[in-house]
A protein has these predicted regions:
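C-terminal alpha-helix
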Residues: 83-90
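Short, conserved beta-strand/beta-arch hydrophobic-aromatic motifs that form part
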Residues: 40-58
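Negatively charged, low-complexity tracts enriched in Asp/Glu with abundant Ser/Thr
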Residues: 1-39, 58-78, 90-92
Length: 93
């Protein structure tokens, strides 16, 4: 799925994150997504400069469950990218 339908702010974050992240439709909304194998990460929000980002880390096995959540993150792509690097270090298989 391409970045079409994302806001300018979300596209900017997707570009900052690089090719490991993609766009995925989750619950009818386009989000930025990365699959880590047994876990995945969903980044939503950020539709405008004032709108915060929200990050959810999902455990997929043995059942689907949110294991970490980061809510109301300021719209700072570099800061969000650093947090996602830390998350990747914990969950990337």
């Amino acid at each position: 799925m391409n970045a079409r339908g994302l806001s300018r702010c979300q596209r900017q974050l997707l570009e900052e994150l690089g090719e490991q992240y993609c766009v995925n439709r989750i619950d009818g909304v386009k989000c930025i997504y990365r699959d880590f194998g047994d876990h995945d990460v969903e980044i939503c929000g950020g539709r405008t400069i004032r709108a915060p980002f929200h990050i959810f880390v999902w455990q997929k096995k043995p059942h689907l469950e949110i294991v970490e959540r980061f809510m109301d993150l300021p719209h700072d792509c570099k800061q969000v990218a650093v947090l996602l690097q830390q998350i990747a270090q914990r969950y990337d298989a």
